[in-house]
């Protein structure tokens, strides 16, 4: 995993993942579980998706996205990540597990689910305006988030189901995102 270099949160997650994997190799006697989660959604979640729906953003009838980009996105419910964390602590399982609900939602579909109209915008204009809004402290996220939204991580959850023994109850579909 390389993360998204211009979005520090993503970059740091990838660095921590690499360090944990190195530790796991150097200390096989220690049980290490690395959980790579997709975007968590639910009524108690505070993350980038929930911030995009808060004031003043919720008053806009549209949401910008990079023209030509309609990436597939995955989600994981609060209930599922809670169960996965519990099982990781209680079980003897070891290794790296990708955690996401089954299926994907396209970014423009997510925008419509949020009750907005997708507004395609040239990449340079969107990056520049987001950087300016971040610098002015008017946006809750830096322009680097656009890379994560253009090139999101889509997980293969086979090991979660077969080795870890858990299949998320909620899927990455319209019903779960709402």
Region roles according to the model:
Residues 2-10, 65-71:
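A short acidic, glycine-rich active-site loop
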Residues 144-157:
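Active-site loop of classical SDR/Rossmann-like NAD(P)-dependent oxidoreductases
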Residues 4-33:
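Active-site Tyr-X1-5-Lys
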Residues 11, 73-79, 105, 155, ...:
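Residue-level signal for the nucleotide or nucleotide-sugar donor/cofactor binding architecture
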Residues 15, 46-50, 65-89, 95:
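Substrate-positioning beta->alpha
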Residues 23-73:
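NAD(P)-dependent short-chain dehydrogenase/reductase
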